[in-house]
Amino acid sequence: RTVLPDSVKNLPRMEQMKYRAEHYPLPDFTAPVMNGLAARFKWSVTPNYADANHEPVIKGALAMSAKPGEKLKLKYTVTDPDKDALTIKWWQYVSAGTYRGKVTVDDPASANTAFTVPADANPGDTIHLILEATDNGTPQMNRYHRLIITVAE
């Protein structure tokens, strides 16, 4: 849910949509969706599981709570059923959360890293982090895991 500033709430609907697009862009999932569709088509005509590519698997927390300035350890297990090499990337899904500042994790290319809640975050704010895993199979497959961090008092 996007929280619009009061100055935008009273604008006509089209202006509100333009504001959202400019300030809260949606991630572009087009290529991963198309690759997922292509892989599923291949599954339907491939009799052996091992002859097709499958998406990575991510295991770890879905939600955490922490105070402003507190450092959280992010420990996730990321595997690929086909034993393909994986690329890991953490990123902030700004438009899903209520905290509007930019955040980063200590090592965005590692499934095991840390994150410090910004000092200016308010209790009740939510920060949505996405752990994205991409394999090097054909077609490339992605898995997304959302972590919702709620800022505590």
Q: Language-model segments: which ranges?
A:
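A post-motif C-terminal structural segment
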Residues: 1-48
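Proline-centered linker/hinge motifs at extracellular inter-domain junctions
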Residues: 48-64, 86
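Low-complexity "stalk/linker" and mucin-like segments enriched in Ser/Thr/Pro/Ala/Gly
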Residues: 58-60, 92-120
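Short, solvent-exposed loop/linker segments at the N-terminal edge
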Residues: 64-72
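Extracellular acidic, Ser/Thr/Pro-rich low-complexity tracts
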Residues: 77-82, 94-95, 135
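Short, solvent-exposed loop/turn segments at the edges of extracellular beta-sandwich modules
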Residues: 134-140
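Extracellular and select intracellular beta-sandwich modules with Ser/Thr-enriched
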Residues: 140-147
